[in-house]
């Protein structure tokens, strides 16, 4: 929109078009009616005096996140979690820094934060892993590394892409049945390349995806799968699922005398409405 400036001369300046929440909602309904689609409230983008409204179809699914953790010693954990939704997908990342304490926390948080930024920029998981590998290798002359565990779920189709580099097995709960997924591979930052593994699965409303650090699996995967099936049958929220897993794993670790950082990150899909 062009408006006359307050100056005495006949000079005009550009002003961004502004929309209120009710106006944006009304626009979404009207454009959706024309397109015969249910649309989200549009994003308002302004650049060089031009305002653009970006409409997108409402996703079929929505993601609900939850996480819980316990440090092996003190209050510093080497595990780091990132959970967020991009315009079309739900993203969940868990990185486990080598060892425990502050050095592990630095590596874990660096890997998770950098991976999240790359994914938000549209970088594929495999390429993001290679870039994180280089970053960790150059961080210091001392050996450092972190596992990289991520899942990306398309909220329109339910297609889930999993990528693991050195990470502990994760879990999927589909149709009420839980199963472990993932094999052994090297963490990022250890070698010149990344020996990661990727997999594609299909999820739907009511399903869970769970990423855990190796400290949670001190007694194996069987009890985790059983607990997840019980939690799914009860319809527990992701935050409660994660809390139960961590508390149970912590008690088991204390009995065995092998404490480690313990973390669980949980994603549940629900109908988008």
Regions flagged by a language model, labelled:
Residues 93, 164, 209-211:
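Residue-level marker for buried hydrophobic side chains located in beta-strands
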Residues 57-79, 129, 133-141, 168-200, ...:
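PP2C/PPM family metal-dependent serine/threonine protein phosphatase catalytic domain
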Residues 6-7, 60-62, 87-91, 205-208, ...:
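Short hydrophobic/glycine-rich mini-motifs in sensory/regulatory modules
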Residues 26-49, 105-175, 249-260, 264-269:
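Catalytic core of PPM/PP2C metal-dependent serine/threonine phosphatase domains
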Residues 56-58, 267-273:
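Short beta-strand-to-coil "C-cap" segments at the C-terminal boundary of structured domains/repeats
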């Amino acid at each position: 929109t062009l408006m006359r400036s307050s100056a005495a001369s006949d000079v005009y300046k550009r002003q961004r078009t502004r929309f209120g929440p009710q106006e944006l909602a009304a626009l979404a309904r009207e454009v959706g009616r024309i397109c015969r689609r249910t649309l989200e409230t549009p994003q308002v983008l302004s650049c060089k005096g031009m305002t653009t409204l970006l409409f997108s179809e409402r996703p079929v699914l929505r993601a609900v996140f939850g996480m819980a953790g316990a440090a092996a010693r003190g209050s510093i954990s080497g595990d780091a979690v990132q959970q967020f939704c991009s315009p079309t997908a739900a993203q969940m990342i868990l990185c486990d820094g080598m060892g425990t304490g502050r050095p592990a926390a630095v590596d874990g948080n660096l890997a998770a934060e950098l991976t999240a930024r790359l994914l938000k920029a549209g970088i594929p998981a495999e390429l993001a892993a290679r870039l994180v590998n280089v970053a960790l290798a150059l961080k210091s002359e001392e050996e450092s590394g972190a596992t990289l565990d991520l899942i990306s779920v398309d909220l329109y189709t339910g297609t889930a892409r999993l990528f693991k580099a050195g990470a502990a097995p994760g879990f999927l709960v589909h149709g009420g049945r839980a199963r472990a997924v993932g094999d052994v591979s090297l963490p990022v930052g250890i070698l010149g390349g990344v020996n990661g593994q990727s997999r594609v699965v299909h999820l739907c409303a009511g399903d869970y995806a769970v990423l855990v650090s190796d400290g949670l699996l001190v007694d194996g995967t069987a009890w985790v799968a059983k607990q997840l099936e019980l939690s799914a049958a009860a319809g527990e929220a992701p935050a409660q699922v994660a809390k139960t897993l961590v508390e149970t794993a912590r008690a088991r670790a204390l009995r065995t005398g092998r404490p480690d950082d313990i973390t669980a990150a949980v994603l549940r899909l629900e109908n988008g409405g």
